[in-house]
Amino acid sequence: MANIKSKVKSIAKQEEFRQRNNAMKTRVRKAIRAAREAVLAKEEGFEKKVFEAHSIIATAVQKGVYHPNKGARKSSRLDHFVNEQKSKQ
């Protein structure tokens, strides 16, 4: 445990950010999973879930949870999956 007041505050702040980042990463994973499942199940309006997943990924990048390249990679892989499934139909 830190003895210096500023370090105690810093540790508390880092813990806050860690929890916030983990929550955002969970949102991204759930959105991608929901979009992929909607595509596989051939649900009506799966495009909306894909759009929502892209939006959540972009938000995570804006908030600094993900590096921009990682966000782009996640979006690209989701698009690739969707296009692959469309071509199979």
Swiss-Prot record:
Keywords: Ribonucleoprotein, Ribosomal protein, RNA-binding, rRNA-binding. GO terms for molecular function: rRNA binding; structural constituent of ribosome. GO terms for biological process: translation. The keyword Transferase does not apply. The keyword S-adenosyl-L-methionine does not apply. One of its GO terms (cellular component) is ribosome. Residues 76-89 have a biased composition (Basic and acidic residues). Disulfide bonds: none annotated. Residues 68-89 are annotated as: Disordered. Pfam families: Ribosomal_S20p (PF01649). Binds directly to 16S ribosomal RNA. Belongs to the bacterial ribosomal protein bS20 family. This is Small ribosomal subunit protein bS20. It comes from Mycoplasmopsis agalactiae (strain NCTC 10123 / CIP 59.7 / PG2) (Mycoplasma agalactiae). The gene is rpsT.
